[in-house]
Amino acid sequence: MARELRMLLLWGRRLRAPALAAACGGKPVLCPWRPPAQSWGPPRSLASSFHVGRPFSSQAAEDQAEAGPLHSVISSLEAVQGSATKHEFQAETKKLLDIVARSLYSEKEVFIRELISNASDALEKLRHKLVSEGQALPDMEIHLQTDADRGTITIQDTGVGMSREELVSNLGTIARSGSKAFLDALQNQAEAGSKIIGQFGVGFYSAFMVADRVEVYSRSVDAGSLGYRWLSDGSGVFEVAEASGVRTGTKIIIHLKADSREFASEARVRDVVTKYSNFVSFPLYLNGRRMNTLQAIWMMDPKDVGEGQHEEFYRYVAQAHDRPRYTLHYRTDAPLSIRSIFYVPDAKPSMFDVSRELGSSVSLYSRKVLIQTKATNILPTWLRFVRGVVDSEDIPLNLSRELLQESALIRKLQGVLQQRLIKFFTDQSKKDAEKYARFFEDYGLFVREGIVTTAEQEVKEDIAKLLRYESSALPAGQLTSLSDYASRMQAGTRNIYYLCAPNRHLAEHSPYYEAMKRKNTEVLFCYEQFDELTLLHLREFDKKKLISVETDIVVDHYKEEKFEDGAPAGDCLSEKETEDLMAWMRNALGSRITDVKVTLRLDTHPAMITVLEMGAARHFLRMRQLAKTQEERAQLLQPTLEINPRHVLIKKLSQLRDSEPDLAQLLVDQIYENAMITAGLIDDPRPMVGRLNQLLVKALERH
């Protein structure tokens, strides 16, 4: 523990690097592991020390750092033999070199990624060739070496290599880095072709962004092949000469420009390698130290990845210290090739996490080569709380591999992943309802956002399957989904009813719910601020309209006589008394109301306000902060006050309007504002305090 703490103190500052931008440890796939020697060089990121024997472990990292000699195949034995022949780049290639040097790549550092990808291609070609011929595989490795004194960076692979003719054609002609021709030859062998990264033939030329000149030494794996040197300063001419001491494979020496000498620094190159090429299939060494020892577990069969591996990989990609609440390891080849892992953090999201400015937390790879650390087009914005990795061979990229093209394919990929995540969360809710309820409590705001911001109704309804609410038909604390509500509906019922209130107590004692109880209709109780806006945007679910009980009271056309009034005649105002009282109230309230009506839907409440589309009006007032005065609100809302002629306050008001008109005015004003507050149409009740005090004084004067 002390050693781990020491490592954290020493290298903890490195944890601020971007997601998926730190290296890890692991075991080579195709060659024996050569442990690196002890080194007291530049600080290493904690993630870059992870070891496959104890995955992602800082202790394993320290053990690795203390063991064994360095391993490198890079030497300086090459020597040019005889004279060189000069060649001119094709016209298209000259133009490409200029584009690459000036504007193709947004970051110079990506030349390292491109050259590593090319080296991986060369090794994959060699592997395929030897396996098809039944030969044993040699050590298949990629090595990088930095030399700050000479201002160079070297990359060497032990791959298939190139002949003289291949050097001229592959490095002197656009779109012929070798991969395209190789794929043509293997067009009927999908397994081999699918692993070739370099599709565009321009990655090699990215070296000229930082190079004064580039030397390439290469020797083909074919028997009897000689070694050659290719040399160019990118000015439009290159030369090729025979060379001795060349090892099978390809070695590229980049002589850096004065303004690019940073790439002769081991620390700088390490950061770039761990950012982009941490999961290359072949062992990758920098100055003799193994770099890419972390497995790309998203490429593995899900059943072969243990819970512990997922926990450690989650901490790596999310740069977090908790455990994943949910894990989805998703692989498919239809309709698109997708290899992905998604995690939901166990920690409750902070306000920063909720912000739409945060953006995506999913990294995009193509055949284990990083394309984007925050792939904004791969998942819709509402799923930004999901951490993980997506790897797809079908994604169209521009020449620099850095920006996704807007295309139907990208939208299709986003749709596939969104649907799969929705299905996953739906399945989890059935598997463990209590765990899902905790998830929805923490992440429900994102789900609501998804419904509000999605245009397609079908997708809205898919996302709506994740919503959870309490219900009048279920005990307090028990949640239900819209699908479950629909399954309990009686035949012929077409509406799903809901009521927005701060809590269950207020919902159950709402005059609007009281009016619905007589109909014995299930009502969903929605407690969160944005529930109302969410359901207004959703509009319907499974061909059933979503109706607020407040709206239902306004649009329902059944007659009051449908309610059986069992109250004795003396307990209710007569029809004439009611008509006279309503006329007086219209005059007393003036422009604050549009009309006064009678209702027999209420039992315990004296009155309620009805407004067409109450929820939309309430949201409009809240968001726009309009209509601050009562008259302005009334003009916008056109509210109707519905009174209960059986309530003691209404009956007493009928008496006071003649005997004590001043007290009656105070009382009707208070009844009106109480109804407005209950409807959520008045946010600040403080202005009524003076009137309440007057009513209290009037009450005490009688004692």
Swiss-Prot record:
The modification Phosphothreonine is found at residues 173, 493. One of its GO terms (biological process) is negative regulation of cellular respiration. The keyword Nucleotide-binding applies. The lineage of its organism: Eukaryota, Metazoa, Chordata, Craniata, Vertebrata. It comes from Bos taurus (Bovine). This is Heat shock protein 75 kDa, mitochondrial. ATP binds at residues 118, 157, 170, 204, 401. It is found in: Mitochondrion; Mitochondrion inner membrane; Mitochondrion matrix. InterPro entries: HATPase_C_sf, HSP90_C, Hsp90_fam, Hsp90_N, Ribosomal_Su5_D2-typ_SF.
